[in-house]
A protein has these predicted regions:
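General secondary-structure edge motif
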Residues: 17, 24, 41-42, 52, ...
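Surface-exposed charge patches
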Residues: 35, 60, 115
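PAS-family sensory domains
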Residues: 14, 51-66, 68-140, 150
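PAS-family sensory modules
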Residues: 1-50, 76, 130, 137-158
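Short, contiguous, well-ordered secondary-structure segments
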Residues: 38, 44-45, 57-65, 110
């Protein structure tokens, strides 16, 4: 797992601004994310900050990872138990929980397991939404499929 900050700070600011707009529906936020990153494989999502259960995931999750969308929103630990690669699981969950507990936006790179068994590398950018009591209440994020970039880096190409 990699926890480096985005190299394009402007991109991160645009994404966080888009996700911080409470009046927008997640479908609108999803459309904005796709407009900001044309041609990129990405998943827009929203979930509970305390349980990490997803309440929304964009249709692209099915294309990128192959799981039915319903699993994301009906299985409380789906992301942690199924999506995150077993070798990255404890570190990814701990990092996300620590940053969320501190009410800090964060981003991290981890391996995921697709429904067909493929390994997919995801760069997850997370916006922490603070509730009325000053604690994290919601998480909104975007998962970018960076598998090709990681493979190019590993082989020395690019």
């Amino acid at each position: 797992m990699q926890t480096d900050s985005l190299t394009d700070a402007q991109l991160k600011d645009q994404i966080c601004r888009a996700f911080g707009l409470e009046r927008d529906s997640m479908e609108t936020v999803s459309a904005r994310a796709f407009d900001l990153l044309p041609g990129r494989d990405l998943i827009v999502w929203e979930g509970d900050a305390q349980t990490f259960q997803f309440s929304f995931v964009s249709d692209s999750a099915r294309t990128i990872l192959g799981y039915p969308l319903e699993r994301w929103t009906t299985e409380p630990t789906f992301w942690a138990d199924t999506v995150v690669h077993p070798d990255d699981r404890s570190e990814a969950i701990a990092f996300c929980a620590l940053a969320t507990g501190r009410c800090r936006d964060h981003d991290f790179v981890y391996r995921a397991i697709a429904a067909d068994g493929r390994t997919v590398v995801l760069h997850d950018v997370v916006k922490v939404i603070i509730g009325t009591r000053g604690v994290a209440s919601r998480l909104r994020g975007i998962m970018l499929d960076v598998t090709d970039e990681q493979n190019e880096f590993a082989t020395g190409a690019g």
